[in-house]
């Protein structure tokens, strides 16, 4: 999957493990947990888009994600948010852990370093505020799949069915 550096289809994600220390302790070696997280993320990236997954240090994993619009109805941004939700649910189901995902959309490939700094600063400053959620840096709101449920007066639900429709 080729990355088009001039498209509005490039996203940077910071996936923060909410209970990293506890999960690492459950594995015989700390590297095994990191490998399991990277494997889940890379599998989903490969299935629904393109990009790379890397673990810099501590409890945060990063993904540079490139998605193509699947149709004229679903924007690359909504598709990326749906992929984030797929990450969140897969980590919860497979590793019995929760994560918070910070998403930013640089305009061009050259903006990726600045986006990395912005997303890292946001994650470090607010990691104690967010738990098991997706934080959209562009509009600092919950994704539209959550917002619809809240607008209807209902409590937000785990939108896995909607996610599969989006992806």
Annotate each PLM feature.
Residues 1-167:
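Hydrophobic, helix-rich cores of sensory/ligand-binding and other regulatory modules
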């Amino acid at each position: 999957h080729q990355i088009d550096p001039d498209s509005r289809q490039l996203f940077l994600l910071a996936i923060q493990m909410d209970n990293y220390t506890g999960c690492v302790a459950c594995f015989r070696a700390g590297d095994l947990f990191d490998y399991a997280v990277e494997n889940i993320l890379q599998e989903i990236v490969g299935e629904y888009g393109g990009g790379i997954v890397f673990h810099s240090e501590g409890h945060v994993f990063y993904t540079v994600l490139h998605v193509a619009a699947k149709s004229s109805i679903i924007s690359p941004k909504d598709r990326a948010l749906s992929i984030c939700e797929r990450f969140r649910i897969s980590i919860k189901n497979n590793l019995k852990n929760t994560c918070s995902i910070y998403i930013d959309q640089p305009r061009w490939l050259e903006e990726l370093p600045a986006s990395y700094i912005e997303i890292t600063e946001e994650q470090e400053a607010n990691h104690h505020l967010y738990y098991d959620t997706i934080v959209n840096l562009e509009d600092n709101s919950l994704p539209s799949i959550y917002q619809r449920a809240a607008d209807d007066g209902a409590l937000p639900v785990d939108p896995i069915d909607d996610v599969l429709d989006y992806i």
